[in-house]
């Protein structure tokens, strides 16, 4: 950070601002990142690799899938939209900033490749309840959290929202004009292609081992897959193990999307998001979702998943409608603490817990990172709106560039917050 003060100006200026850098600079912050391996080629890994390549860093990617954009990132079409909250909490801020970052990045990729990665349908975020809608109306009247440009979002009543979406909706909500649908898997592959990042697929990394020079990636037979001074873990639910961070706080959230016929909900013009969501994909099929099949429950039967999704569909519409289930899509998300991803240097949790044991009243220990080991994981259900922004932040931290985020957001995303939460639970 900088210490800013006013001083006497020069020329025709009465005053000028004078800044002195007060942030401590050490060998680690001045260390130049030159050679990086990214583990994982989903939305997180592909975006991190792209940003590193743009920064001039030599980077390559390893993943267990044959091609980038597999696993939970393999959606043919996913919804890209911000979320509104009247208090503009951290989740809403990251969602908005990430939405804009992803839209901008997709525009660049489409211009360079001629591919169609985005369908500009708009998106309607319907209020979950009448009370929430009233709260939104009150907030809009008071310009909370700030005045939103009409070109970005409009708050519509139920009738107007229904006309915009093409269906009779149960209540009103925010219409985000620049939202739409993204070819998620193709987005990942295009990032890698445009950045010319080498990809080693069909390769499972089971361990990341510290060496004097950096880190070794090992496979199931103990073989060395690769080595680099810096490694970024973007391996979804495998990230905690690979980052030596058992308290990273990622939770596996299996989920299923119900697919309907192309003739169902024929009037639907854009995605509608509320307790659940409905959308029409470019191939015509309608999708309804999605389930959150918590690990604490028994594995769900397919019929139970469809029933849950159709219940979500009913919560969005005024009148029930006849639809026919044709199939499903399923995947396992990795959700971070507080529904926020883990982005930053991997924490040396053993050293952190030792320091906390010596000073039980302290929860803010600096210098507890694992040098050269980084994490970007836990995007949850918001991979499209979180990934580009998270990658920007991480690569700025890695390259010691000016970090495009304030301190509160960096702390909220820090991988250290998992072990901090664990230590606090021990005190209860």
Mark where each language-model region is.
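Active-site substrate-recognition segment that forms the wall
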Residues: 37, 44-55, 64, 72-73, ...
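Beta1/beta-strand and adjacent pyrophosphate-binding region of the FAD-binding site
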Residues: 28-44
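Short beta-strand to alpha-helix junction loop
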Residues: 93-98, 130-132, 174-190, 300-305, ...
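A short, basic/flexible loop-to-alpha-helix module at the beginning of a structural domain
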Residues: 17-33
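Dinucleotide-binding Rossmann-like beta1-alpha1 core, especially the glycine-rich loop
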Residues: 77-163
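Helix-loop-beta segment of a Rossmann-like dinucleotide-binding subdomain
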Residues: 86-87, 115-125, 149-194, 291-296, ...
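Helical element adjacent to the flavin cofactor pocket in flavoenzyme catalytic cores
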Residues: 1, 174-221, 225-226, 230, ...
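C-terminal catalytic lobe of FAD-dependent flavoproteins
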Residues: 323-428
């Amino acid at each position: 950070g900088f210490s800013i003060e006013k001083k006497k100006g020069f020329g025709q200026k009465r005053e000028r601002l004078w800044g002195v850098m007060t942030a401590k600079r050490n060998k680690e912050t001045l260390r130049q990142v030159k050679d990086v391996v990214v583990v994982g080629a989903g939305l997180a890994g592909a975006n991190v690799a792209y940003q590193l390549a743009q920064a001039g860093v030599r980077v390559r990617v390893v993943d267990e899938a044959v091609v980038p954009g597999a696993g939970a990132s393999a959606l043919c079409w996913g919804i890209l939209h911000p979320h509104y909250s009247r208090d503009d909490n951290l989740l809403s801020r990251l969602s908005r900033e990430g939405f804009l970052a992803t839209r901008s990045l997709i525009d660049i990729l489409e211009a360079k490749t001629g591919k169609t990665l985005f369908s500009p349908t708009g998106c309607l975020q319907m209020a979950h309840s009448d009370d929430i809608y009233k709260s939104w109306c009150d907030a809009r009247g008071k310009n909370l959290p700030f005045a939103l440009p009409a070109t970005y979002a409009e708050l519509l009543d139920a009738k107007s929202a229904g006309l915009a979406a093409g269906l009779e909706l149960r209540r009103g909500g925010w219409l985000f004009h620049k939202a739409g649908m993204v070819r998620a898997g193709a987005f990942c592959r295009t990032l890698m292609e445009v950045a010319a990042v080498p990809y080693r697929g069909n390769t499972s990394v089971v361990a990341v081992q510290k060496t004097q020079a950096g880190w070794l990636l090992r496979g199931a037979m103990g073989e060395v897959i690769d080595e680099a001074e810096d490694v970024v873990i973007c391996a979804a639910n495998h990230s905690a193990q690979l980052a030596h961070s058992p308290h990273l706080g990622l939770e596996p959230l299996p989920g299923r999307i119900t697919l309907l016929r192309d003739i169902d909900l024929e009037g639907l013009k854009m995605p509608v998001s509320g307790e659940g969501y409905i959308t029409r994909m470019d191939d015509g099929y309608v999708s309804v979702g999605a389930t959150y099949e918590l690990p604490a429950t028994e594995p769900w039967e397919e019929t139970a998943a469809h029933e849950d999704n159709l219940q979500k569909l009913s919560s969005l519409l005024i009148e029930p409608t006849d639809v026919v289930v044709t199939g499903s899509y399923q995947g396992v998300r990795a959700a971070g603490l507080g529904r926020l991803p883990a982005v930053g240097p991997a924490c040396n949790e053993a050293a952190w817990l030792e320091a906390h044991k010596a000073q039980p009243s302290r929860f803010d220990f600096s210098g507890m990172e694992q040098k050269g080991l980084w994490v970007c994981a836990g995007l949850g259900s918001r991979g499209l709106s979180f990934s580009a922004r998270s990658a920007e932040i991480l690569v700025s931290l890695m390259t010691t560039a000016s970090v495009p985020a304030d301190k509160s957001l960096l702390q909220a995303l820090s991988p250290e917050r998992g072990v901090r939460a664990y230590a606090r639970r021990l005190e209860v």
